[in-house]
Amino acid sequence: MIIIFRLFLIFFSINAYSLEIIRDPFFENYFKNIQLKYNLPVANVYIVDHNEINAFVLGNNVYFTKGIIKNIKQEDVLKSIYFHEVGHIYHNHYNSKKLEINSSKKNKVYNNILSIGAAIFTGNANIGIATNLSIDQSILNNLSTNSIRHEIEADNFMLENISKNKINTSDLIDFFDNLPESNNRFYKSHPTNKNRVISLKKYTNFKKNKNSINFEWLKAKYGRNSNIFEFNNFFSSLNKGIVNITDAKSIDDINYANYEIYKAGIMIDDIKQMYLNLIEVNSNPYLKIEFYNMIIDNNISEYFEIIERNKHNSEIQSEYFFYFLYGKYYNKINNKDLSNFYFCQFYKVADLKDKSDYYCNKYDINSIPKIDNSYAILK
């Protein structure tokens, strides 16, 4: 079988140590809705702050760069690329590659690829919740070299979903034909564009779909090149500290526009209600982490019970800042043992020995409830 193209888990050759992950609840929920619509395997999807045209998979996580979002003009192209990425997850390629690397380089640890941005650890333990993590570049380089078999399997998964969902591939063909020369290195071990185009042409007769409003919103946010020019104006103005809320009136939920305004550091009316409205339509756990952090910072004690209850939510627990949030929460309500316990876990995860040693020696293990202790990194 002809290998159509080598999409992703691709090798980054960027001269940087790490790549910043932007946490965007709207972006992440957009892909969650795609998963539900097309009955795809569950995956977390994040955006990376880099202009390289790229996407890759680590574990059950899919990463898209800002550059690829900017350069994709049609939503069906993004969906097709996403199908390919999910194909890697469906076939468990990441774990296969990780095992291969670990067996050949036993002196290195490849499990912990996420490292916290050093800047957020300045100051005291009352720092806010940061919105980014970073991906260790050297580890990514080793993990993202695919075998031909992996690419065939991911291509097949993509084509099955293109065919099943009748997605037109004309714009996908154009996307690959127009890739900058700097990206050609990703395809050196694969057939020419001509062969890829031949394989995709059988799907060019399907009816083209119109871009969704939410796709256009993401295009405006990360590329300033949405077909809805008012969205571009909204984000361009916001970047200058100017709020033109009328430019965002076409968005499905105006609370998302208010969220962007708030995240830009501009005060809005009733922040609490904005978060409550968003959480009704968007179950993203990071959005909840942000909301709980705002509750703690503003001492809105009527919602402390919600924070307490959601400590047992597995999605909240999967968030990198879970331990930090609950260390901060218990510090707010003057439960010093639980606060130090959770900060201890957080700094262990972050691999900051001085801070972890400090907090891990400041609580009485006998005062920690069994349910909390069951969440510990340190048993």
Language-model features: where?
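Catalytic Zn2+-binding segment of zinc metalloproteases
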Residues: 76, 86-103, 167
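Solvent-exposed coil/turn segments that connect beta secondary-structure elements
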Residues: 50-51, 60, 67-69, 86, ...
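Post-HEXXH active-site segment of zinc metalloproteases
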Residues: 93-121, 128, 176
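Extracytoplasmic
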Residues: 26, 40-42, 50, 57-63, ...
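Substrate-binding clefts and substrate-entry loops adjacent to catalytic sites
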Residues: 92, 119-146
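Hydrophobic or amphipathic, alpha-helical segments that drive membrane association/targeting
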Residues: 4-7, 12-60, 91, 140, ...
